[in-house]
Amino acid sequence: MKCPFCSSEDTKVVDSRTTIDGSTKRRRECNNCLKRFSTYERFEESPIYVVKKDNRRVKYDREKLLRGLTFATAKRNVSREELDKIITDIERSLQNSLISEISSKDLGEKVLEKLRELDQVAYVRFASVYKEFDDIKSFIEIVEEIKKD
C-alpha cells in the first residue's frame, strides 16, 4: 500500500477491524515517514439490477432504499444503525444468491419481511406505499393480518 504522504510503498498494518457494512478498516503506518493513515477494503460486488413493473432495469440504489426506510420509520424509535443492518442483510442475501436481477416486487417483500420484525407501524407505512393502498380497507386488512400474529 502506497503512503499518501510520501508515496513510499513500505507500510505496515497496525490494526484491522470489520465495520458494520462488512468492509475492513485497516490502520497503517508508513515505515519511511512514520505517518499513519486508514484504508478501507471491501469485496467487489457484482452489480444488482432492479426490474421495475414496466420491465425497465435500473441499478440497485442503496440510498433510495434507505430513503424509503427512513420515511417509513419517521418519528419511530428506530435507529439509523438498524436501518443500515436491514439494508446490509438484504444486500448480503442478494449477493450470496448470486443473482444479478431482482424484481421490485421481490425486493419490496424482503424489506417488508425485515420491517415486520422491527416495527409494525413502519411495516404498515412501507406497505401502504409499496402496495399502493388507495383506500382505508387496505389499511384495515394489513392491520388485521398483523394482529393474527
Swiss-Prot record:
Cofactor(s) this protein cannot do without: Zn(2+)
Zinc finger (unnamed): 3-33
Family membership noted in the UniProt record: Belongs to the NrdR family.
InterPro entries to which the protein is assigned, alphabetical: ATP-cone_dom (IPR005144), NrdR-like_N (IPR055173), RNR_NrdR-like (IPR003796)
HAMAP family to which the protein is assigned, alphabetical: NrdR
Cofactor binding note: Binds 1 zinc ion.
PANTHER family: TRANSCRIPTIONAL REPRESSOR NRDR
Organism: Fusobacterium nucleatum subsp. nucleatum (strain ATCC 25586 / DSM 15643 / BCRC 10681 / CIP 101130 / JCM 8532 / KCTC 2640 / LMG 13131 / VPI 4355)
Function field: Negatively regulates transcription of bacterial ribonucleotide reductase nrd genes and operons by binding to NrdR-boxes.
Keyword Protease among record annotations: no
Protein origin, superkingdom: Bacteria
Location of the ATP-cone domain: 48-138
Protein name in UniProt: Transcriptional repressor NrdR
One annotated GO biological process: negative regulation of DNA-templated transcription
Alphabetically ordered keywords of this record: ATP-binding, DNA-binding, Metal-binding, Nucleotide-binding, Repressor, Transcription, Transcription regulation, Zinc, Zinc-finger
Organism taxonomic ancestry: Bacteria, Fusobacteriati, Fusobacteriota, Fusobacteriia, Fusobacteriales
Any one GO molecular function term: double-stranded DNA binding
